């Protein structure tokens, strides 16, 4: 609970978002592990600080690693498609 409250999202807001996302990561659709309040990360727009959704650790790390850069993400998709 503490981790998400530091991001300005309390228990009720977290649960509302989770219901809207069908208890899944907003990106990969992985189900929340065992109803654990801290199993998803609160994702925020790094520029505005607005809450965008709840992400699993892997998806959150992936976005952070590319710095939310759409060009980089598109290049990664093209790279993977090239080798399909």
Positions of PLM-derived features:
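Contiguous alpha-helical segments
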Residues: 1-41, 46-84
